[in-house]
Amino acid sequence: MKNLKMSIAAMLLLAVSFTNAQEKEKMNHDHGDMKMDHSKMKMDQMQDAKAEAVLADYFTLKDALVGDDTKKAAQSGTKLVASLKSFDKSSYTKEQQEELVDIIDDATEHAEHIVKSAIDHQREHFKTLSKDITDMVSITGTKNTLYEQFCPMYDKGSAWLSASNEVRNPYYGSKMLKCGKVQKTIQ
């Protein structure tokens, strides 16, 4: 008899919970006809694309320095200058815009020096450029995982960003290709 009462109670409990689940489902609203303003979303996507274009050009420049290719580094510097100059800051707060103006102006100056210089001088400017791009990413964010890598030997220690956690040193290139370590992961 006790088992029968327990079975009936369990069935009653199941029936009540099933009824509640059906009622909750009826409460879900259909938003199919609702109009949404996607302009902000499109702006954010365009902004992400501009930030990612700057990063892509930066990585191309880094890879040219890793490969000891002065000419390709100069060409990459030219592309990076264009990406930096076309970067739209309008979707950021006033404070962020002011910071971005300073960062982008400085980064542009160093990228322009890279365009006109021999590889040793390109690497000197790449150090400051890397700091600028890292500062920019701290404001803009990124959709990809980045790795801040560090070489303790170049100019008393120098960092750069990479899309790979595998260390490829742009400051020494083939001389010390794997000198360095990942010091931070940026997501």
Please describe what each predicted stretch is.
Residues 2-7, 17-187:
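Intrinsically disordered, low-complexity terminal tails/loops enriched in metal-binding residues
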Residues 12-16:
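Hydrophobic core
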